[in-house]
């Protein structure tokens, strides 16, 4: 089943039912997928959707959070969150943080801008600073990236930036990454083999 950020839960679509038995698990994983691109027809968002299909096919509960319609402002560095356990800024960041805290696995999807993660992804990471003093469930963290450039080292800085966040949560780890280069205009990733790789990565969460 799939849950959206509106807390709606969907059954596995008919076209995925043939994949449902691929992996037997002792328990269902709760997976949060955060798609950070704000562009319609985003290539990284399409990678995220394939990752979700794979995770659902493996029997997991998946919720996709798109930042497209979210209000997430910049961190002010006041550190009040360390005492309160939440941010004092009243926008969507606190709700997303609670979902991340209670997830078993997290997948970030971002376009690469100037060889780094998107600004909105970094802003959300900064705003979840309250988690540093809280207990958390997540263990495995995944990163999906896309870019116009196709050199293999294009996503390295984004991966390093995410690892800096992961290092603050010793029980978690970077469990997998996937990069698709050579995709610039919206939806140019259609038909790319990386979509299947994203499905397989999600299936093995």
Regions found by a protein language model. Name each.
Residues 71-73, 150-152, 185-186:
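A short beta-to-alpha transition loop/helix N-cap that caps and shapes the active-site region
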Residues 29-32, 105, 142-143, 178-185:
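A short small-residue
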Residues 119-120, 132-177:
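Short, glycine-/small-residue-rich phosphate/pyrophosphate-handling segment
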Residues 2-110, 115-131, 190-205:
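N-terminal beta1-alpha1-beta2 submodule of the flavodoxin-like/Rossmannoid cofactor-binding fold
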Residues 153-156, 187-192:
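Short, solvent-exposed loop/turn segments at secondary-structure boundaries
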Residues 36, 67, 145-148, 180:
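Cofactor-binding loop segments of dinucleotide-utilizing enzymes, especially the Rossmann-like FAD-
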Residues 162-183, 189, 199, 204-205:
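A charged, well-structured terminal subsegment
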């Amino acid at each position: 089943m799939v849950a959206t950020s509106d807390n709606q839960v969907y059954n596995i679509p008919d076209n995925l039912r043939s994949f449902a038995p691929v992996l037997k698990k002792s328990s269902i994983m709760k997976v949060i997928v955060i798609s950070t691109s704000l562009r319609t027809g985003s290539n990284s968002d399409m990678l995220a959707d394939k990752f979700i299909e794979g995770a659902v096919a493996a029997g997991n509960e998946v919720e996709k959070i798109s930042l497209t319609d979210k209000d997430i402002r910049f961190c002010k560095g006041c550190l009040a969150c360390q005492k309160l356990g939440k941010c004092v800024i009243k926008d969507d960041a606190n709700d997303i943080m609670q979902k991340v805290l209670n997830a078993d696995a997290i997948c970030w999807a971002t376009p690469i801008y100037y060889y780094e993660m998107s600004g909105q992804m970094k802003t959300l990471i900064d705003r979840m600073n309250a988690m540093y003093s809280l207990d958390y469930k997540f263990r495995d963290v995944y990163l999906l990236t896309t870019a116009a450039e196709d050199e293999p080292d294009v996503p390295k800085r984004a991966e390093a930036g995410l690892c800096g966040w992961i290092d603050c949560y010793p029980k978690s780890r970077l469990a997998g990454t996937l990069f698709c280069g050579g995709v610039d205009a919206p939806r140019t990733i259609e038909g790319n083999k990386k979509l299947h790789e994203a499905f397989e990565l999600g299936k093995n969460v």
